[in-house]
A protein has these predicted regions:
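Surface-exposed alpha-helical segments enriched in charged/polar residues
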Residues: 206-209, 241
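Extracellular/surface-exposed low-complexity segments
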Residues: 235-247
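Extracellular/luminal ectodomains of secreted and membrane glycoproteins with large N-terminal domains
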Residues: 200-201
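Active-site-proximal acidic segments at structured loop/helix or strand boundaries
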Residues: 161
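Concave beta-strand-loop units of leucine-rich repeat
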Residues: 1, 7-10, 15-21, 27-33, ...
Length: 247
């Protein structure tokens, strides 16, 4: 069955949650001028049409297990995309050029993501998916500051060209190689439960920047830096003094 909303051209924000027996939802006709949508926990939703909702700025579509794809139209103002816990295996976001924050976590079969070249994306959350490589994704995100890609199938991760990265969660993959920008100061670096050997960990430690001593007077508390690398083959034999010398 379909959910019919009527004609609401003046609606700016739409929230629809926990609805059953609805397989298709077409927002193009009902609310073409909507700027924010929150579509969650539709147990039976298989098809969602938002191609003609050109004014969308925030897209939240989550916890719809039977929803395997979304066809995006031109959404030049959309800045945030929250689409976790769906059934996506592949997704193209090329028609959303203004995106800054992406959350596609817990799409358990998602293994392919297309982005525009040289986006302004600052945060990507794809933990709990099925990615074997995200090299092409990283190339499109020179402004990336936060990456969460834990619980995937990654064997290598190279962020050498992502100079703004400050938070990285890549634990519970199969990483044998992890590279970060030379001299980078990551406030959070969680790379435990991978396959990083002694040399890989030492190389990672060498790449990290020197933590500066806080000034005697400062208006805000000094930053804290956290790293977790246990449960790797090289965790016991790596040179922890490299890290100690940077503090």
């Amino acid at each position: 069955s379909d959910l019919h909303l009527g004609n609401m051209p003046g609606m700016k924000s739409l929230v629809l949650n926990s609805i059953t027996d609805t397989r298709e939802l077409n927002l193009n006709t009902f609310c073409p001028n909507v700027e924010s949508i929150n579509i969650g926990s539709f147990a039976d939703l298989e098809h969602l049409e938002i191609e003609d909702c050109f004014r969308l700025r925030s897209i939240q579509v989550y916890s719809n297990p039977k929803l395997t794809s979304i066809e995006f139209g031109s959404h030049p103002e959309a800045e945030s995309l929250y689409c976790s816990y769906n059934g996506f295996s592949s997704l193209s976001l090329k028609s959303l050029p203004a995106l800054r924050d992406i959350d596609l976590s817990s799409n358990e079969v998602l293994s392919h993501l297309e982005l525009n070249e040289k986006t302004s994306i600052s945060a990507i959350l794809i933990q709990g998916c099925a990615f074997q490589s995200i090299t092409d994704i990283l190339k499109c995100c020179p402004s990336l500051r936060e990456l969460s890609c834990s619980y995937n199938k990654l064997t290598e991760l190279d962020l050498s060209d992502n100079s703004n990265i400050s938070e990285l969660r890549c634990e519970h993959n199969q990483l044998t190689r992890l590279m970060v920008p030379q001299g980078s100061l990551l406030e959070h670096l969680y790379c435990h439960s991978n396959q990083l050997d002694e040399d890989a960990l030492n190389t990672l430690f060498d790449s990290l920047g020197q933590v500066l001593e806080p000034a005697i007077y400062y208006p805000t508390p000094p930053r804290q830096y956290r790293i977790s690398f246990n449960d790797n083959p090289g965790a016991d034999d790596c040179n922890r003094n490299i890290l100690n010398d940077k503090n």
